Structure formats: structure tokens, C-alpha cells
Amino acid sequence: MQMESYYGAFHADEAAFFFPHHVPASPELPFGLIASPEPEPEPEQAAAEARQSAFQEYGGAVHAGAPAAAGAVTTGGTNIHRRVMDVLGRMGGGGGGGEKGEGEEMEEEEEVPQRRRRGQGADVESSRGFRHMMRERQRREKLSQSYADLYAMVSSRSKGDKNSIVQSAAIYIHELKVARDQLQRRNEELKAQIMGHDEQQPCVTVQFEVDEPSSSIDSMIAALRRLKGMSVKARGIRSSMSGNRLWTEMNVETTIAACEVEKAVEEALKEVERNQPDSDAPFPGSKGWTQTSHVQNVF
């Protein structure tokens, strides 16, 4: 039988060396031989098999040229160690492959979040790079617009390149500062002319009062003419008429003594009253005409 020949060859060659205690089941046995029950042997055959020994005599190494027994497993001259390793490899191949597959699946499951994180990191980096690119583009656009506006103001004296625009703008700003300083000085001069005096020149205040003047306007004109004849400049005049009394105050610039200015004003007022039509009355007039004047230094 095929099973007996297989076990006989295995016991003779391999089982005694690798499995001293028991003989393992062979993975190469057909399923039908294992599942189907063997027919019961005849009594004579059973007695003969009972007398047979479990061991066979060793007849020496089988030569390569000798024919193999019917149903025996031939080794083909292969080393026993290699055969055993091949058998064990075939027996453990399925389990090892399964363990390897599970390990690969676990590694792949662990790599999925890492890939996702790497993908998210790449997205963040790409978005940051995009925002940086947009900000840089906006900055360059603003800079170009500023150069264009500056060139519009200095186009007559500048070339189109940026260095010429900046240099021309700097020169133009310096010229504007010089012009501003000149205008400020001119403004101060005009203010001094409007005020009508030089701050270095002394100033005095002339005050006079006239009771019942014949003509207040004539009195004022006469006083101003007399001051003009003395090269005296009037800075300001303030006058008021209360009842029959004329009160006048003048601020004048003069280098003449204050007493001389006072005498000149009094003489001018007296001359106005003499020239009036009713000047037949003895001076200072029957109308009780009186005049007083006062000069005080302001500066």
C-alpha cells in the first residue's frame, strides 16, 4: 500500500534521526486516504502483519542507478538536511505569510495617519507660501505705484529709472525747503512794514485834549501834518469825542525828544483855532477854549 511504503521509507531514513519519540503526520497524504476507513484485512493477512516487525533491515545506501521500490519516496540523492528544511519551509510558509501580512497591514495602518499629517503639513506649507507670494506681489505693486506718482511730479527733470526719480525728488525737496525759508523771511518783512515801524526805533505816545474845538477833524489833520513835518511816523491813532471834548492818543516812532513832540502838537492845535472864522476874540478865545497835551515814552 502507498501509506505503508511512505511510512516505511520515512522510518528507514528520517524518522529515527529527527523524531525518536513519534512520527508526525505527513502533510502530503491525500485526504481520501485519511477520511475513508480502510477495509478490514482478512484473518490470515492480519496474522501475517501482526508477526511483522515495525523495523526493516538496513540494506545499505541505495545507489543512484538502482531502481526504487514501488510506491517508495525517492530522494534523488538530495541531502537529508535540505529535504527537511524544504519540508519545514513548506509547512510554515502559510503561517509565516499570514503573520507577515498582518504586520504589513499594521504598518500600513500606522503609515496612513503619517501620510495624512505629511499631506496636511504640505498643504499648510503651500498655503503659507501662497500668502507670502501674494503679500510680496502687493508690496511690489504699491512700490511701483509710488514710483509712478513721484515720477509724475518730477518728470521734467528725471529719467524713467528709479534711481533718477529718487535723486530728482531729493533735489526738488531741497529746493522747496529753500523757497519756504525765503517766503518766511519775506513774510516777516511784510509784517514789519504793515506795522509801520522798526522794532529797533523808540516809540512814544502823544495824548492831547481840546475843549469845544472849532473842528475836531481839522485839529487831527493839523497834528498829523506837524508830526509828518518832523519825520515822525504814527503807528496808531485812537480818538474819541465826548460832549464838547476831543480826546486823542497817538503812538509814534521818533528819535526826537518827547518834550519837543509835545510842543509841536500844541502849536499845531493853536494854529488851527487861530485860522477859524471867529478868531476875532482874544486868544485863547472867548469860548473858553483850552487844550492840554501829554507825551509819554512807550519803549
UniProtKB/Swiss-Prot annotation:
Domain bHLH, chain residue ranges per copy: 127-176
Annotated segments matching region Disordered: 90-127, 273-299
Mitochondrion recorded as keyword: no
Biased composition regions of type Polar residues, renumbered to the chain: 288-299
Entries under Gene3D superfamilies matching the protein: Helix-loop-helix DNA-binding domain (4.10.280.10)
Keywords assigned by UniProt, alphabetized: DNA-binding, Nucleus, Stress response, Transcription, Transcription regulation
Subcellular location: Nucleus
Region (Helix-loop-helix motif): 141-176
An annotated GO cellular component: nucleus
Expression induction: By abscisic acid (ABA), methyl jasmonate (MeJA), drought, cold, salt and wounding.
Entry-linked InterPro entries: bHLH92/bHLH041-like, bHLH_dom, HLH_DNA-bd_sf
Pfam families: HLH
GO biological process terms, semicolon-separated: regulation of DNA-templated transcription; response to water deprivation
Cystine connections: none
Subunit description: Interacts with TIFY10A/JAZ6, TIFY10B/JAZ7, TIFY11A/JAZ9, TIFY11C/JAZ11, and TIFY11D/JAZ12.
Cited function: May act on an initial response of jasmonate-regulated gene expression toward drought tolerance as part of a BHLH148-TIFY11D/JAZ12-COI1A complex.
Family in the record: Belongs to the bHLH protein family.
Protein name: Transcription factor BHLH148
Organism: Oryza sativa subsp. japonica
Lineage, top ranks: Eukaryota, Viridiplantae, Streptophyta, Embryophyta, Tracheophyta
